[in-house]
Amino acid sequence: MNTANVKAGETVMVVGVGGIGINAVQGARLAGAKNIIAIDPLENKREKAMELGATHSFASTDEAMETLTDMTRGQMADSAILTPGLMTSEIVAGGFNAVGKGGVVVLTGLNKLEEQNIELPGSIMTLFRKSLKGSLFGDCNPTVDIPRILGLYQSGDIKLDEIITRTYTLDQVNEGYDDLLAGKNVRGVVIHSHD
Ligand SMILES: NC(=O)c1ccc[n+]([C@@H]2O[C@H](COP(=O)([O-])OP(=O)(O)OC[C@H]3O[C@@H](n4cnc5c(N)ncnc54)[C@H](O)[C@@H]3O)[C@@H](O)[C@H]2O)c1
């Protein structure tokens, strides 16, 4: 909603449907996007995305290109929000190719700090007026956005309980990391016991 500035009727691609990406899907839906294409190699992630507002889902950006081209009559996506576990130059290029004229590619996923993971044709970027933007914590302003998000949760417009695949005690935290790496969880949550 904030970094890609999604508007009603737009086409948004979300690449990587984990704890972050599932909420990019929900944000795109709330902002009124017409087409929300969720990309994830794992079927459980794609299913959750479809449940929470995605209109289409594919295992890779490449597989989405034909449908994306058809549904937008070649204009392509207005934005691509990249939320994979590990950002690679292939994923950045996939998002760059998926957006059309004036399209915005949002980089949320991370990699090693020194990793060179952006390799793009600059002339196409200029001629198509595409832009690439980094986003930290959804570019939110906690003072106003956290109460707003809580209100949207209370009214049922943002689903938070539904995205929790499993909860863990603090003692089970390593199991939680194993499940995260194995792709089992859309969102795993550690519950601190107070007794
Ligand atoms: N910018 C920020 O403010 C911010 C904040 C927190 C986390 N992060 C970063 O965001 C990223 C996502 O975090 P998360 O907690 O959602 O992780 P996660 O592991 O829950 O989700 C990542 C998802 O990406 C999918 N994926 C892996 N390779 C893919 C590919 N080639 N194409 C499409 N999908 C692919 C995985 O299957 C998984 O569903 C991480 O890199 C994390 O470090 C950024």
Predicted regions span which residues?
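Mid-domain Rossmann-like dinucleotide-binding core that forms the NAD(H)/NADP(H) cofactor-binding site
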Residues: M1-D62, E66
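Glycine-rich cofactor phosphate-binding loops and adjacent beta1-alpha1 units
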Residues: T3-A8, E47-S131
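Structural detector of well-ordered beta-strand residues that form the stable sheet scaffold
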Residues: M13, I37, V104-V106, K133
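Hydrophobic alpha-helical segments typical of transmembrane helices
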Residues: A24, K45, I91, P121, ...
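Residues in the short beta-alpha loop(s) of Rossmann-like NAD(P)-binding domains
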Residues: L42, N111, G138
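Conserved beta-strand scaffold positions in the cores of enzyme catalytic domains, especially
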Residues: S57, L132-G134, I163, T167
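C-terminal hydrophobic helical "lid"/dimerization subdomain
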Residues: E63, S79, A93-N97, K101, ...
